[in-house]
Amino acid sequence: MQGRKRTLTEPFEPNTNPFGDNAAVMTENVEDNSETDGNRLESKPQALVPPALNIVPPESSIHSTEEKKGDEYNGNDKDSSLISNIFRTRVGRSSHENLSRPKLSLKTASFGAAESSRRNVSPSTKSAKSSSQYIDLNDERLRRRSFSSYSRSSSRRVSNSPSSTDRPPRSAKVLSLIAADDMDDFEDLQKGFKSAIDEEGLTWLPQLKSEKSRPVSDVGEDRGEGEQESIPDVHTPNVGASATPGSIHLTPEPAQNGSVSEGLEGSINNSRKKPSPKFFHHLSPQKEDKDQTEVIEYAEDILDFETLQRKLESRPFVLYGHSLGVFSPTNPLRIKIARFLLHRRYSLLYNTLLTFYAILLAIRTYNPHNVVFLYRFSNWTDYFIFILSACFTGNDIAKIIAFGFWDDSEMFKAYGREYKSILQRSGIMKLYIYLREKYGRKLIDFIIPFRIISPGEETKYQRSSLSTSLTKPYGAKENQRPFGTPRAFARSSWNRIDLVSSVSFWLGMFLSIKSYDTKTGIRIFKPLAILRILRLVNVDTGMPSILRGLKYGIPQLVNVSSMLVYFWIFFGILGVQIFQGSFRRQCVWFNPEDPTDTYQYDMQFCGGYLDPVTKRKQNYIYEDGSEGSVSKGFLCPQYSKCVSNANPYNGRISFDNIVNSMELVFVIMSANTFTDLMYYTMDSDEMAACLFFIVCIFVLTIWLLNLLIAVLVSSFEIANEEYKKKKFIYGSRKTGYVARIVTGYWKYFKLKANQTKFPNWSQKGLAIYSHVEFIFVILIICDIGMRASVKVSTSANCNNILLKTDRGISIVLFIESLARLVLYLPNMWKFLTKPSYVYDFIISIITLVISCLAVEGVLGHMYAWLSIFHISRFYRVIISFNLTKKLWKQILSNGVMIWNLSSFYFFFTFLVAIIMAVYFEGVIPPEEMADQPFGMYSLPNSFLSLFIIGSTENWTDILYALQKHSPNISSTFFCSVFFIIWFLLSNSVILNIFIALISESMEVKEEEKRPQQIKHYLKFVYPQKIQEYTHASLVARIRKKFFGGHRNEDTRDFKQFLMRGTAIMNIAQNMGELADEFKEPPSENLFKKGLSKLTIGVPSLKRLRMFANNPFYKNSDVVFTETNDINGRTYILELNEYEDEKLDYLKKYPLFNYSYYFFSPQHRFRRFCQRLVPPSTGKRTDGSRFFEDSTDLYNKRSYFHHIERDVFVFIFALATILLIVCSCYVTPLYRMHHKMGTWNWSSALDCAFIGAFSIEFIVKTVADGFIYSPNAYLRNPWNFIDFCVLISMWINLIAYLKNNGNLSRIFKGLTALRALRCLTISNTARQTFNLVMFDGLNKIFEAGLISLSLLFPFTVWGLSIFKGRLGTCNDGSLGRADCYNEYSNSVFQWDIMSPRVYQQPYLHLDSFASAFSSLYQIISLEGWVDLLENMMNSSGIGTPATVMGSAGNALFLVLFNFLSMVFILNLFVSFIVNNQARTTGSAYFTIEEKAWLESQKLLSQAKPKAIPNLIELSRVRQFFYQLAVEKKNFYYASFLQVVLYLHIIMLLSRSYNPGNLIGYQGVYFMFSTSVFLIQEALHMCGEGPRLYFRQKWNSIRLSIIIIAFIMNAVAFHVPASHYWFHNIKGFFLLVIFLFIIPQNDTLTELLETAMASLPPILSLTYTWGVLFLVYAIALNQIFGLTRLGSNTTDNINFRTVIKSMIVLFRCSFGEGWNYIMADLTVSEPYCSSDDNSTYTDCGSETYAYLLLMSWNIISMYIFVNMFVSLIIGNFSYVYRSGGSRSGINRSEIKKYIEAWSKFDTDGTGELELSYLPRIMHSFDGPLSFKIWEGRLTIKSLVENYMEVNPDDPYDVKIDLIGLNKELNTIDKAKIIQRKLQYRRFVQSIHYTNAYNGCIRFSDLLLQIPLYTAYSARECLGIDQYVHHLYILGKVDKYLENQRNFDVLEMVVTRWKFHCRMKRTIEPEWDVKDPTVSSHISNINVNLEPAPGILEREPIATPRMDYGVNNFMWSPRMNQDSTMEPPEEPIDNNDDSANDLIDR
């Protein structure tokens, strides 16, 4: 055996040399010779497989490249290390990317003898050195990187003396000690990880992948069938070292075919026969600042693109098939038409005509006087529109003739591609084949008489399904040719739109005869006829990139949309059941004297009324006077009745049928104006109606709509990536025309600028200017500050002074720009390369002209609009601060894409506005414009209406108004459809893509993720997991103790975890700047720094120095120590908490450890207190030693170490809960109604609580001190909250007793903070709260800065334009001058005289404060439509408002609103999502890691299935089992499906006025539930009750059916007045709708992923709920008696805690929060307060603004967006295709479950290890693992190539030609790889499961994909990967030993045979004698030993032990027992003899 590493797997292992065996041998020679002569080289490598990271050109180009670049490289990057480059902090990256709250910092030290440290270099370092020396001889670049990366490693191991200062103190806590005994395992771990990050190995760190570097074909086609797949593997082992003739080389020579090497990971075929253009891939693009980029160059055999384009154009023109079944491919007319259509000029002509067509339509709809449009020819434009429409129809017909309508299979056939028919795409083919397989061909063919699939297609389908990755399909080609001609007409999306337009145009023309369409109200064909104008978004600009993003996401969009539609229908049916008829009931006033005199209230819904005499509640009544069934909800006042008549908005809005209900459910889904519907139903039914809306919002909006967002984000990212790749290959040809021009000029300017240098005078001038530039920035600040100081009351004189000052500043800034221009005159090109300078120069001229004209009084109000030029200079202020400059730079890194998307959005809105204007013009009468200003009256109005819908604010006002005036039901329906489609497109799609763009600019780059992941693991995950292994909260310990822990906690796992962490830490410190970051001391606290400086300067403050230098405020360090001594090397990981320094400090200042400067650590009372409570922070000390806090410590023997502390915590947790309950119960309203005096039971309870919490405070502060002590009370933030609560409770009590009601209620609100203590129950909830409130504050601050930098300039501009212009007189026809006296005002139906008042609206811009407040409020998109309406109606200062008098004013608000949506709202989402991802570490997961984590969630939900033993079952049970469980009977299965779907149809057909249908429905539901009940009975009988109830879904299904059956039966006898009963019955009938879920894989995957993601979602919901409770209690205590205003009602108020929570829920979605806040600011004289009591109905402006604004930020901006982040993170499996496109889905998991159930019929989830190969061979798919699969299995080969004569089984005919052809398709290299992978897989399963003695269902399921579908190297995180490497190392060792053992076994067996033959009696004869030899066969040779001789048994072959000892998960297990005992018992007398032989 060779004395090297294992030969079997070496060349494919990460830590081996990549140059094959010879290279490895030579490397050793180099290492040995390096000591004597390092310059000598004996041989060169024969085979070169470059590592994935160092992609080196072929040998011919290496030296030339290096010679050219050598000098430059030496000069610029002498000491650069590849590893350090990877870990280097990127230039231009923000510092906040590094985690800002390090828990632990790392220090390293090394101890031992100096000699040993130099010589005892670790093997990993040796191998690294040897490798680097060898590479040095080949590539100068690699040598430098290698030596620099390992120089740190060598220098670190130089020992220090034992007295070194770096040595950790003796008091340091040992976290992990790797002693000499464990060193072997530790070294294995370290080597494995080292190899994973070494340059030589297949690295775990990010690399350039071959598939990514492969250029995309010119048409962007996908991979062909014949392209090789790479086998996912961590190490890809070599199969043989020697190259014998006919052997397979996995490391081919460069001259060999590259197809073999494509199968290897990370390898790129570097040699080509011809020279070709080279593509440069940049490893680190962040180095632009240094004007140097590390370039990795390799050659690709790709033609020049211009040549390629010319070849494509000159390709012969070929048509295929018969278009329309008539025109052949050679038809001259067809060929002429095709050539004409494909001509470039024709395309230009078509686009020109289409643009002209759109312009005509815009002119026609801009200000329409005659709304009869399109077919009446009432305007000159109609003639042109008709002619163009006819031309476009001709274009469509020509295309159909030229290229066919749909079927282009002939073209696919000619190009050798697979053609998918409609049946295949729709899944009908798959279903048909499944049915034929399950129920038999005869039955299915009998039921479906026509042929869905031909025999030839079926054979082809089966062959394709049997294809395997180990074969190359027949005729497979490397690259698919692009199509030379367009596909069939209807195969293009745009052509389909054209077809719809053409058909609709002529249909509409036909219907317009005799004005039939106008009379009947058929309007739908008009908008469809002009749909083709949408083609204009696909012109040559950046806009098609948006469409590409949507196209990439279509498959996932369909999946998510199907889920969304399913639950949309579900809630639609539920809405009909609960709320049918609810909106019909409204209050109507009846005149007591004249019953015919009535008045209907406006939108006051009700459920009953009060009797005018008795005041008892009465049931509602119908329009005909009959009484309703029940009284509920809001009760109409006296003399009013609750009448059920018609639905609002002309009967269009209701829950009365499924269509209307689904419309309103969509309104809920939109999360805007839905709370209006909620409060309507709360009035008409019960308060519990809000639950429907809350659940709807959670399921549809927060969950499923966010999944839709996630699809868009991910698909847009994929599209963007593909676009960048194509742009990289094709250059700028793929970008838009404008972008190409700009880019060209920019490059030209930069080129010219670099050719000229500045003279000395210019350089000096620029230097001087850089020092004085800040003065001009200050002038800009003065200018904008001056503008902000203007108010509506500012005098004309002041305005003139301001104008003159502005002119002066403009002159100065113009001079500055001129000076800059003069300084840049020697090199004007340089000036042009500075866009800010060019912009400043242009703006200075414009502003100077404007200012001069303004002073002269020429401009008037136009000056306010033009002041935007002055204000735009504010950008210089923003970029003068580094933080804001960096943030904006980061956000605008995708500036081009943001610009493209913005232009796309507005242009698309414009085109859709034309279509909408055509459809809706004339629907709402013009006289309604005053009440409904936005109703699609004209093109501009339609544009604004669509923009409003996109912003979601009050979008339903437009919807309801248009539905109200629609002429018929179909128009109403299409109106809803159009609005819903536009809402989804504009808001859910386009605006959410902005989130993707901004998030992309903030997320961690792919190549930085792995280094950041290591850093995050070592700083956060590792310390936290160490804590979690031994500590748990009280609730967690109670759960573990009494309810059993779900996890099997094992000390061996913990030990292995510590070893892994130590290994990672040991390696990480050698990684360039990552190591430096760990080694640098923790940053000093700014407070301490300032304090220490202060004390130096001021002698009197010397005493404060003890505060500055206090070691108790230092952060802990993790110290990694390596020692070499006589006992061997050891590694120690210690936690240094500076305990020695702390004890020294206490000796110097002993009073520091005295609580209240009185209680010493030894004081009895203090020690008693310490027994009751854990330390507030840190460890306690008595001055001589420290004591570990063991409160939360637990082990298997003891869960409660300090029972008294746990009891104390439990008591005060109960007290907190009681306090919360009392606060919710004893509300201010309760106190007032019960007329509570000063002293009552509530006051006594308050005193009790105050006493209890005061005792808690005393105990805690005596135990640990109050503010300045080692474990001070206030150092714990939770204690600080408790302290605030306690103080507020004392103040509240004193104020209450002194009858100071105002002070009392204010401080009473603070007691709500105590509810935050509920968060401490759950660690996850506490971490979530910390993440939101503390860790996220800096991100919120950054987002706030960006918001402010936008809000401030817009506020100033808005103030300039609109100050004093928004006021109106309440008598709308008068201006301010005439607004006095009284006027007649209509109240209800009476005219009342009211005083005229001129006032500003709630949102106005009269001063900077009001303008800032108004614009801040409309950022939340609440109220901006009201402000828009006021601005558009404004006609001047003090003049009366006119409807749409100044429509142009909308420009300001639309621009601000759009920018705030993009850069403020979406920015908040992006910042919060990004911050949460970085804090939790998910931001550092690569695409593959995310895909694997998501697959894990799906796999973890799989459970083994139990099946009965069919042999033991009786015939009846067998029949039931086949019928009800397996559903083998087609007719029975079909019957069940028909019953189910009829049940759903009955649910859908429910409506308010169904006539007799209710009876029919009840009867059918009785029938369907009976059928389902019988089915469940049969199922239970067939499967058996035990197995039946083992599946939760069976139990749930049975419960639902039984309840539905019983309630349905009882419902026939229950009257309608018991509406709760009927609602519950309807709900259970509806739940049967959920039975569809198991039949749909997409829905099942969604729910299974939801179950796996439940813990984090519940945790976040719980945290949010606690905050709801805190704010609800606070608002209730403060505003519980505040009077109702115009925006508050009987339900929208804070009178009770429940109502408060509902209002907070409304505010969380921005619903009218600012108007509610305005109602809470009411003050005297508009409210009253009683001096004699504590009751007042006044509000509080301070508290209203503080509470509601903070809730708006916390809940609406943070928590709702955290749900977005959580949903996107946890459900990305549902929408992401997966990094490796693994194909793991429910159907594949089902195959595995079925295969497992064959062997484990009881469903125990455990099987013997021997079953493993049988399970793996029993099914197909990505979860199976076998060597031969698909067509290569024996069964398939026999079926395909062997014919057996049924009469004579020995008559066999073999198709040798076909068989050989099939066998030639085998990829031999992959087969050999796969064999080794299979051996590894089997052995790793044995290894990991040997301790349990069996295979576990879930463990095996989670292991298989790592060997089949995923690459462990790419998909595993750092900890899991090192774990995987450790196991793989053990497995490889075993495989190597097994091979050695096989050889040894062969030798021993032969030796035993010879020994045995010698002991036998040999007969003597001459073998050569033929007579003797003829008898040999008849001789029975007796092999028994002669009597009397010692009987010896054959020697047993020693075997490797598979037992527990060898596979223990601990490195310290006893390895002595390595031999199996003999299989048969051996006589004791023979032991010595056997021992002798063994020796």
Swiss-Prot record:
Residues 122-132, 147-164 have a biased composition (Low complexity). One of its GO terms (cellular component) is voltage-gated calcium channel complex. The modification Phosphoserine is found at residue 284. It holds the Pfam family Ion_trans. Disruption phenotype: Growth defect at high temperature, in the presence of lithium, and during calcium starvation. It is found in: Cell membrane. It is a multi-pass membrane protein. Residues 1-171, 206-288, 2011-2039 are annotated as: Disordered. InterPro entries: EF_hand_dom, Ion_trans_dom, VDCC_alpha-1_subunit, Volt_channel_dom_sf. Residues 2021-2033 have a biased composition (Acidic residues). Coiled coil: none annotated. Residues 64-80, 209-226 have a biased composition (Basic and acidic residues). The keyword Ion transport applies. Keywords: Calcium, Calcium channel, Calcium transport, Cell membrane, Glycoprotein, Ion channel, Ion transport, Membrane, Phosphoprotein, Stress response, Transmembrane, Transmembrane helix, Transport, Voltage-gated channel. Gene3D superfamilies: 1.10.287.70, EF-hand (1.10.238.10), Voltage-gated potassium channels. Chain C (1.20.120.350). GO terms for biological process: calcium ion import across plasma membrane; calcium ion transport. Glycans are attached at residues 98, 257, 269, 379, 559, 754, 760, 882, 900, 968, 1153, 1240, 1302, 1433, 1640, 1687, 1732, 1770, 1785. The keyword Coiled coil does not apply. The chain crosses the membrane at residues 346-366, 384-404, 563-583, 658-678, 691-711, 766-786, 809-829, 841-861, 904-924, 942-962, 978-998, 1207-1227, 1247-1267, 1277-1297, 1340-1360, 1408-1428, 1452-1472, 1529-1549, 1554-1574, 1596-1616, 1618-1638, 1654-1674, 1748-1768. Residues 271-281 have a biased composition (Basic residues). One of its GO terms (molecular function) is calcium channel activity. Its main location: membrane. PANTHER family: VOLTAGE-DEPENDENT CALCIUM CHANNEL TYPE A SUBUNIT ALPHA-1. Belongs to the calcium channel alpha-1 subunit (TC 1.A.1.11) family. Voltage-gated, high-affinity calcium channel that functions together with MID1 to mediate calcium entry into cells. Required during conditions of environmental stress. This is Calcium-channel protein CCH1. It comes from Saccharomyces cerevisiae (strain ATCC 204508 / S288c). The gene is CCH1.
